[in-house]
């Protein structure tokens, strides 16, 4: 069962704010991981691992490389997410 998109967005924003030391309120769908947040490949790998662990989503390396904005990450995860009771 898909997870509400807003829930995934909040998780991504929270993770990025904590890991990168940025204001979560400034993170939008259009926020670019590298250009706007200056995230490096390790930061992005950690985000992918967090999303996989939290939502049971598997993302290939090729899929991860295609995701460059917060909105793209959320749109990938939300419909594929597994909800645990």
Identify the role of each PLM range.
Residues 1-24, 79-85:
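Thiotemplate assembly-line natural product biosynthesis machinery
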Residues 44-67:
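Phosphopantetheinylated carrier protein domains
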Residues 65-84:
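C-terminal structural segments of small proteins and small subunits
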